[in-house]
């Protein structure tokens, strides 16, 4: 019985090391490949992205990366054969607010990429990097490496539109009859 518990624990830990996920309310700004080959996403929620959410599927389904102009990587999963599946989250207007910063960042074992944030004088984030796509390749020795496409997301270009309910919630609010 103890053997079965140990095997289950090992399989469970191995499964967790093959996937990573940022969620619909965070963005991937970096990626790390450990010497052991374990890949991790670095996730963040910049303050200018506070009230925004991306639309993410339940699991990593795309074998061909995040190719649409309104998508970025929300997570990934490697199956037992070593194939990489990406979870492509959609954000309405991404093509308007973000431009390609790096189109081919290569990361191998023992390396990492960390995007940048730019702040204004008040300390608010006005630009940040987000990983749009991850593609896995193998070198001549069969070792996996990853190519990233990185966008620079400009928060200042997002219009600050107040929701429809905002004006009505300001006190005093009186409905005047029209004569």
Swiss-Prot record:
Intercellular signal essential for a variety of patterning events during development. Keywords: Developmental protein, Glycoprotein, Secreted, Signal. It is found in: Secreted. This is Warthog protein 3. Residues 1-19 form the signal peptide. The gene is wrt-3. Expressed in the trinucleate pharyngeal gland cell g1, seam cells and hypodermis. One of its GO terms (cellular component) is extracellular region. InterPro entries: Dev_Signal_Hedgehog-like (IPR052140). Glycans are attached at residues 52, 147. Its main location: secreted.
